[in-house]
Amino acid sequence: MNYHTPSSFSDASTIAAKSTGQIRFLAGGTDVLVQMRSDILTPDDLIDVKQIQGVKDITQNNNGSWTLGIAVTGAEMSEHFEFKKAWPGLVEAADLIGSTQIQGRATIAGNLCNGSPAADSVPAQIAAGATVSITGPTGERIEAVENIPIGPGKTSLKKGELISAIHIPAREKHSGDAYLRFIPRTEMDIAVVGCAVNLRLENDSIVEARVALGAVAPKVLLVEQCSQAILGTKLDEEALSNLSAAAENACNPISDKRGTKDFRTNVAGVLAARAAKIAYNRAQGKSDE
């Protein structure tokens, strides 16, 4: 195995593009190192990106948007007061990834690149309207987060490409987000269903909404029908019922030891309504209490 410590994303991309074997990028390492120690994975080229400038930075830009380095951990997001205030749902999602120790190492960039349909932070990123910078052999491009996962363990990243930054929009006035999941245990488990909602209000009516569902399909879903179900409403009971129905209709889950298809589908409808209520209250400036 060759171990690389590039000083730039361009160098990292070049190494990956030239590799003739299996490659892995290393930031938090909470998955790749476990796989290596368990002899599940032995990459030919392990590319450690932690020496690249800016990978640990959380930066608020002049327009209020945010840029997250790809080695920023969930714990670091949670400890950043202004970011947590702006995007509590996204931070809550990151806070659910593993144990306290894992949260001190795991990154939401890695959570995205794993391609897991049950990844906690990915629905929240999608609901937020996050995009990523991707560096590759032909330069840099911007892509919406919802276009990165394409199936279990698979992403749309091409050979030699890696995510070089995550971009989160500015928090608009009278808007809020939330993330909820269902798990069999009280903590440290994989989501049976996850749901993130981000919405904006004008005169208490919803004028913008994004709803994302996790663990109910081969990849995390951005569900336009859920958004349409609540647009123009003040999230009354009829709107919540329509939202739940739209969430259920979007589901195409598997049955496994953690939940049947029917159970996951039902829970998706319940979580969508609950997450929407929390996001709506936050958009109104109300406390979560």
Predicted regions and their residues:
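C-terminal structural segment of proteins
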Residues: 1-289
